[in-house]
Design a protein with these regions (language model features):
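Glycine-rich, basic loop-to-helix element that forms the pyrophosphate-binding segment
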Residues: 61-78, 88, 99
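A conserved acidic beta->alpha catalytic loop
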Residues: 23, 38-47, 63
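Short aromatic/hydrophobic "clamp" motif used to bind/position activated sugar donors
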Residues: 83
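A recurrent flexible, glycine/aromatic-enriched loop bordering the glycosyltransferase active site
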Residues: 125-126, 138-140, 146-167, 189-191, ...
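Short, acidic, metal-binding catalytic loop of nucleotide-sugar glycosyltransferases
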Residues: 22-31
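A short, conserved alpha-helix in the catalytic core of glycosyltransferases
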Residues: 158-209
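Non-catalytic, C-terminal membrane-associated alpha-helical segments of glycosyltransferases
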Residues: 247-324
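Conserved donor NDP-sugar-binding/catalytic core segment of glycosyltransferases
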Residues: 90-133
């Protein structure tokens, strides 16, 4: 049995596939399987993979079902104890996979471990060193745009970034996998939040380096698609993972946070899209009540720890503050 399965979702990403797959297949120090889930690409991706990378398992879906459906397909096919999710617009270092596997083996309570993601064109700058979330309802990619030397230490994070992270295969299955109602955006944070409720940890491993282009599938950093899905998924994620008492406790913070976000997107010309996204979020909550995490008293210590972190992480947005 392989040590790890690398799952790569792809949608019309033929321009990135050679760089990504060549670097993946050059991994050392680990036995691995590679599964590529193609979301109905029409740019020749499927033919390119079949012709040039027969050692990879290619699964072709009939249309674009989004990130969550794609990676769930890969996770369900994985036969290894660990699964790595990797964006197609990446290039990984030779010890990327081995470093992630070693980190997970160090501590069996680790549900996930995020790689050190570096900008593809500015390779000394960070793209993501794990994700955080605060009581304002804001997520933050830790270290984005900072020199990579500032994040040399492995430590605990709120959530692994699903663009380059490793997970315990059986634990992902146990807590229900990625929620396909998300389609794309914040699905990785939702998954790690659920794991946190059950007492599991997410970690950051700087030795696992990956270079990331970013926004290769969806386009620019701020666009209608991203704003619409991110706003709705954020509201849905809060509803799913917070018991009623916790939602009420955070309501003043969330109202302020959502208002600030709305004003920000109004200035970007995307205010209408943000409102539509929130409306979509309420609809997701209504349609998926059965997916709300059931409160159990045994998980109360985890809820308390999460809440303290949500408050603490507000400080990360103050001027001059840097994430630890």
């Amino acid at each position: 049995m392989s040590d790890v399965t690398i799952v790569i979702p792809n949608y019309n990403g033929i321009a990135f596939l050679k760089t990504c797959l060549d670097s993946v297949l050059a991994q050392t120090g680990v036995q691995m399987d590679v599964i590529i889930i193609d979301n109905g690409s029409v740019d020749g991706s499927q033919e390119f993979i079949s012709s040039n990378y027969p050692q990879c398992e290619l699964v072709c879906l009939d249309q674009n079902y989004g990130f969550c459906r794609a990676v769930n397909e890969g996770i369900n096919r994985a036969k290894s104890p660990y699964v790595i999710l990797l964006n197609n617009d990446t290039e990984v270092r030779p010890l990327f996979a081995a470093s992630l596997v070693a980190s997970m083996k160090e501590d069996k309570s680790r549900f996930s471990c995020s790689a050190r993601m570096l900008m593809y064109t500015k390779r000394d700058l960070l793209d993501d060193a794990g994700d955080f979330y605060c009581a304002f309802g804001w997520g933050i990619a830790r270290g984005k745009g900072r020199p990579k030397q500032e994040y040399e230490t492995a430590d605990q994070i709120f959530s692994a970034c699903g663009g380059a992270a490793i997970y315990q295969t059986e634990m992902v299955r146990l807590i229900g996998g990625f929620d396909e109602a998300h389609f794309a955006y914040l699905e990785d944070m939702d998954l790690c939040w659920r794991a946190r409720i059950h007492g599991w940890k997410s970690w950051y491993e700087p030795d696992a380096e990956v270079f990331h282009v970013g926004s290769a599938t969806s386009g620019s950093r701020y666009n209608r698609f991203k704003v619409l899905h991110s706003a709705g998924n954020n509201l849905y994620m809060i509803y799913k993972n917070m018991p009623l008492a916790q939602m009420l406790l955070n309501l003043p913070f969330l109202l302020v946070g959502f208002l600030i976000k709305y004003l920000f997107f109004v200035k970007k010309g995307l205010g209408k899209d943000y409102r539509e996204g929130l409306a979509r979020g309420f609809e997701l909550c209504r349609k998926n009540k059965d997916r709300k995490v059931r409160f159990l008293w045994k998980n109360l210590p985890a809820y308390v720890a999460i809440q303290v972190e949500l408050w603490k992480n507000i400080l990360l947005f103050l001027p001059g503050r840097r994430e630890n």
